[in-house]
């Protein structure tokens, strides 16, 4: 079986359907003895340019190992699902399991925000103890 990287973008008004779509597509892959190496829900993000007069979309990234028939079925599902506004399936040489740069940047921002909150809390506590 070959390794693939799949990215699909969902209409922002259909964001509540994304978990169900992920579950359905994951089941399609695993039922055909495929494996999902990485699954990331990037959430709603700004588009680089408008697509169908939309400026935002809900992004999902999957790295999978699956037979070609499953990939063809996924591609057909993407094409006929009106909620999916764009999709891209690329073949890659090996399984990618590490976090994507999008998730790494989000984690760094989150840890930086927590460290700033901790510093503010420490400063407030120091101010309270001086009084």
Swiss-Prot record:
Keyword Protein biosynthesis part of the UniProt annotation: no
Biased composition (Basic and acidic residues): 104-115
Coiled-coil residues: none
InterPro entries attached to this UniProt entry: Ribosomal_bS6, Ribosomal_bS6_CS, Ribosomal_bS6_sf, Ribosomal_S6_plastid/chlpt, Transl_elong_EF1B/ribsomal_bS6
Name the record gives this protein: Small ribosomal subunit protein bS6
Extent of Acidic residues compositional bias: 119-131
Pfam families associated with the record: Ribosomal_S6
Main function: Binds together with bS18 to 16S ribosomal RNA.
GO cellular component: cytosolic small ribosomal subunit
Keyword Ribosomal protein found: yes
GO MF annotation, one: structural constituent of ribosome
Keyword terms of this UniProt record: Ribonucleoprotein, Ribosomal protein, RNA-binding, rRNA-binding
Chain positions covered by the region annotation Disordered: 100-131
CDD domains: bS6
GO BP: translation
Family: Belongs to the bacterial ribosomal protein bS6 family.
């Amino acid at each position: 079986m070959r390794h693939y990287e799949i990215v699909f973008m969902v209409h922002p008004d259909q964001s509540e359907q994304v978990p169900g779509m992920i579950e359905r597509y994951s089941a399609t892959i695993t039922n055909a003895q495929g494996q999902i190496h990485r699954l990331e829900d990037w959430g709603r993000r700004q588009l680089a340019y408008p697509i169908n007069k939309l400026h935002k979309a809900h992004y999902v990234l999957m790295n999978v190992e699956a037979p070609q028939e499953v990939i063809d079925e996924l591609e057909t599902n993407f094409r006929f699902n009106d909620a999916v506004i764009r999709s891209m399936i690329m073949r890659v040489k090996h399984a990618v399991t590490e976090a994507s740069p999008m998730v790494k940047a989000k984690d760094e921002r989150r840890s930086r925000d927590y460290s700033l909150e901790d510093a503010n809390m420490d400063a407030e506590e120091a101010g309270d103890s001086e009084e």
